[in-house]
Amino acid sequence: MASRNVIILQLRNPVGKEEPLPVLRVYDDIHMLRLKRAFFEDTLYQVARVENADIKIAVAPPSRSVWGKDAIVHLTKRFPDDHAIAGLAARTEIIGQGVAPIEERSRENLEIALKAGYRNIVLMSGYVPTVRSEQVADALRYLSEHKIILGPTIEGGCYLVAMRSDCPEAASMVSIGTDTSYRDTTEALGKKKLKWQEIDLSYDISHQEDIEFIVREINHARFTGDEEIGQCTEAVLSEFMDESEKKAKATSNGRNRTATDE
């Protein structure tokens, strides 16, 4: 352990026929794989810029640990003069996990960090291409005053994204990795007189709406002149969408021909 701080990137079921995400009903495996790899690299690129923090990449199943290794190698080749990327391999550990519900895996990751002696722990998705390094750094910084950092969900709930080691009860009071009632959670924390901070950090992709949301975020960043965000996402996303549209059109034409033939 080189630092008191740790950032855990959780790669939830990257892609595969045995663990289909809802979005795979629309897009085929190979294009979803390329898209999520790009999202992961962008996320890792930003997290690498957070100083004084170790990084752990939790991958399920363990056979996909190559995802983390490949991403580090690829980023190092793409940015050979980048100091933050140059030191990425030395401060990163890859954790292989069994395929289990995300909440169960999150608790396992939390236990690993606590047993390793980390004081400040950030749990976040590995697929957040719109994240900024400042947001992750803020999550760690806020832990100096607040024992718990909550992340909002688009459904109006919340979940635990960061906590201090002196507040292990947070794991049982706040849902980890899944939605829970915002009111119930904040009331429970209030009764225990635990100070918490909310930060928009852990966004994940699991539905078609998520991809559309990310496209809007990338377009907004480009409109406001932020060229750093989405270093490789935009190109891959564009190619991904083009290929998907071609596939959808071909499928539609095929159906029409079949209907005509019949």
What kind of region is each of these model predictions?
Residues 67-119:
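Short phosphate-binding loop-to-helix
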Residues 180, 184-262:
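Conserved alpha/beta core of the MobA/IspD/sugar-nucleotide pyrophosphorylase nucleotidyltransferase superfamily
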Residues 52, 118, 144-148:
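Short, high-confidence coil segments that cap the C-terminus of an alpha-helix
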Residues 36-52:
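A short, N-terminal amphipathic alpha-helix
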Residues 53-63:
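Short beta-strand/loop segment that forms part of the nucleotide-sugar
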Residues 118-127:
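Short beta-strand-to-loop acidic/aromatic patch adjacent to the donor-nucleotide binding site
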Residues 1-23:
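N-terminal nucleotide-binding beta1-loop-alpha1 segment
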Residues 129-155:
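Conserved donor-nucleotide/metal-binding helix-loop-beta segment in metal-dependent transferases, i.e.
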